[in-house]
């Protein structure tokens, strides 16, 4: 679902939508989707205006390039439970259980490694986030809730079990939402593998994603500006940047 004001610039990338629902996609007025190719498996879509470059319907979509390839963490035993953070904070990799609140204006530095999130989530209220060589793994329907006025620069590891993976989740989860609210800018490098999630980019969200592949159940753009370059081409031809499962 692409709502008014959304501007997605992925000129070197492909977007594949597996849905065969009626409609399989909705493009509302005042929107722009620029992609090397946007392939929608279903034949029924709603176009209320906007610009969609290289849009195809009833086409053959690519398979999930990462299905069954991302390992589960070696341990999901809790290391940290129900914390509150304020001010300048440096946090360590580990298993985070329950809800962890990052209060307004927190400046958060994440050390390299894997952050397993379970039985709750992280509630982020403003501030600056910096993390190189990090992976967020959701062991259940837990999430990170990015609220207003967050600025984040996050990149995936360049080696190891989670090489190139910025976000991943346990296989077979029931559907849930993952929301990026009004922010001051996200720069994300790596794969977002969230096949159970309805990912929502809300008003005035801005994101710049380098070397990215995104796999999501559904995506909703609300007045969002997102610039993407591709990461993972898989075993087939061409470059695949985003894949929607339903």
Write out the residue ranges for each language-model feature.
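Compositional signature of intrinsically disordered, low-complexity segments enriched in polar residues
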Residues: 1-246
């Amino acid at each position: 679902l692409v709502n008014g004001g959304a501007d997605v610039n992925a000129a070197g990338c492909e977007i594949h939508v597996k849905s065969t629902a009626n409609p399989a996609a909705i493009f509302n007025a005042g929107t722009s989707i620029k992609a090397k190719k946007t392939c929608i498996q279903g034949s029924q879509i709603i176009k209320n205006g906007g610009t969609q470059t290289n849009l195809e319907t009833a086409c053959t979509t690519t398979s999930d390039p990462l299905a069954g390839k991302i390992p589960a963490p070696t341990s999901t035993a809790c290391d940290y439970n129900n914390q509150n953070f304020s001010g300048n904070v440096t946090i360590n990799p580990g298993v985070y259980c329950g809800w962890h609140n990052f209060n307004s204006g927190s400046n958060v530095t994440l050390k390299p490694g894997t952050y397993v999130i379970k039985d709750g989530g992280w509630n982020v209220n403003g501030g600056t986030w910096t993390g190189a060589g990090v992976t967020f793994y959701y062991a259940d329907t837990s999430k990170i809730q990015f609220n207003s006025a967050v600025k984040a620069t996050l990149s995936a590891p360049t080696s190891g079990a989670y090489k190139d993976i910025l976000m991943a989740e346990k296989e077979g989860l029931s559907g849930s939402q993952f929301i990026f609210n009004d922010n001051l800018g996200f720069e994300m490098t790596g794969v977002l593998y969230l096949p159970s999630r309805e990912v929502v980019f809300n008003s005035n969200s801005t994101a710049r994603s380098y070397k990215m592949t995104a796999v999501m159940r559904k995506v909703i753009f609300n007045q969002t500006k997102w610039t993407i370059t591709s990461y993972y081409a898989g075993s087939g031809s061409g470059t695949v940047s985003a894949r929607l499962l339903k």
